[in-house]
């Protein structure tokens, strides 16, 4: 059993046995009903990517190709334009969060990255002094929230640190998330930001180190309890999945493409489960 599978089962068990129910939830199911959830607070996980520990379960198939494309939309294209996400990457799931008829998700995510020139500043800081302790990406922008409507960012802060071990430099990353749908989005969000970590490490020719993941509110929606029990019954696959970035060390961050990533040794348990999402 991989570390990701062990943590997945532990978190599902903890939510179902110790979690409390939300009240006055904002999200709605497609039938208009309030989408409440059972949740725990303060969930934390640590993965040592350099030792082959990756945050992706084998208990069900996790579609990370589209998730990685979303990272490119946010941090390379640096836009909130849904047409870019739809036409360039073939990803449409953000369309449910379109603000009015603007064709955007409001001043969120990529728009905030562009507004503050976040990636270029981060890369410059790491180039000037890899050991500085100020390598922070924050998408929590109150001014932007007041400017337009839109879903507030869930994965809103990422921090990076560099370590020298036996003469090699390792890039560590910490992702902070205010809210996470355990069964649907947990491993998608984690692997997205592992991909971002790998892109930054490749830019400098460093190795990827540890990935730390903190979630304030980790939940299972009240229409997903049957799927939760099914996942607990499943025995994990014997595979040991790893994400690989197939570009030379020193490849510029903005020259990396989604197809440069490959998920290897991944043979998840099937069939896939169906989820009615809360919007």
Swiss-Prot record:
Catalyzes the reductive methylation of 2'-deoxyuridine-5'-monophosphate (dUMP) to 2'-deoxythymidine-5'-monophosphate (dTMP) while utilizing 5,10-methylenetetrahydrofolate (mTHF) as the methyl donor and reductant in the reaction, yielding dihydrofolate (DHF) as a by-product. This enzymatic reaction provides an intracellular de novo source of dTMP, an essential precursor for DNA biosynthesis. The active site is at 154 (nucleophile). It is found in: Cytoplasm. This is Thymidylate synthase. One of its GO terms (cellular component) is cytosol. The gene is thyA. Signal peptide: none annotated. (6R)-5,10-methylene-5,6,7,8-tetrahydrofolate binds at residues 181, 278. The keyword Nucleotide-binding does not apply. Its main location: cytoplasm. Belongs to the thymidylate synthase family. Bacterial-type ThyA subfamily. Coiled coil: none annotated.
